[in-house]
A protein has these predicted regions:
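Short, well-ordered beta-strand elements within core beta-sheets of diverse protein domains
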Residues: 13-17, 108-113
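Non-catalytic DNA-recognition/assembly elements of restriction-modification systems
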Residues: 5-39
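A generic structural signal for residues embedded in beta-strands
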Residues: 84-85
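Basic, amphipathic alpha-helical recognition segments used for DNA target recognition
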Residues: 26-37, 99-100, 109-150
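Structural motif
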Residues: 78-81
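Short, charged beta-turn/beta-strand-edge "cap" motif at the junction between a beta-strand
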Residues: 89-92
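DNA target-recognition patches
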Residues: 32-68
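Residue-level "contact hotspot" at macromolecular interaction interfaces
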Residues: 73-76
Length: 150
């Protein structure tokens, strides 16, 4: 793990310390929503709790939701984009993609700022601390059907 000579405390952010030259920014300042459709020639991607964003073809278990026959409304995802399953984010179904492909129109796709390191963003945005924030900031009817709105 890389170490730095100086750190600063971030008490409003879980009372942690970060390298002193790092900025603390809200998600909306480093990400913007995008929705590019009609990319039906790209591979199908999905978001899983245990892996984040992966090619759909790499998973073998049965799915409860069938893939649509018409992929024209599916959204383009590029490597480095943050993909959020807005109904399952509270459980951790989020990730920064390493792949280019398309995801369900039910997902939220955010283009991340180029200054972010994708691997670190994936680690942070999938961390327990962030997943807890998705739970806190989601709305629900009952305890299972929760949605997070961007």
């Amino acid at each position: 793990m890389m170490t730095y000579s100086e750190y600063k405390s971030v008490p409003h952010l879980w009372d942690i310390s970060i390298p002193s030259h790092w900025k603390v920014l809200p998600l909306y300042a480093i990400a913007k929503e995008k929705s590019i459709c009609n990319c039906t020639d790209l591979q199908l991607l999905s978001v899983y709790l245990d892996e984040g964003v992966v090619p759909f073809s790499t998973r073998t278990e049965r799915r409860t939701n069938a893939t649509s026959a018409d992929l024209s409304k599916y959204q383009r995802v590029d490597a480095g984009d943050f993909v959020l399953n807005n109904q399952q984010a509270w459980r951790g179904s989020v990730g920064v993609s390493r792949h280019t492909g398309i995801v369900s129109p039910a997902y939220v796709v955010l283009q991340m700022d180029d200054t972010l390191i994708s691997e670190y963003a994936n680690y942070l945005l999938r961390s327990r601390i962030m997943v807890d924030q998705y739970l806190i900031n989601s709305k629900s009817v009952g305890s299972i059907q929760r949605n997070i709105y961007w």
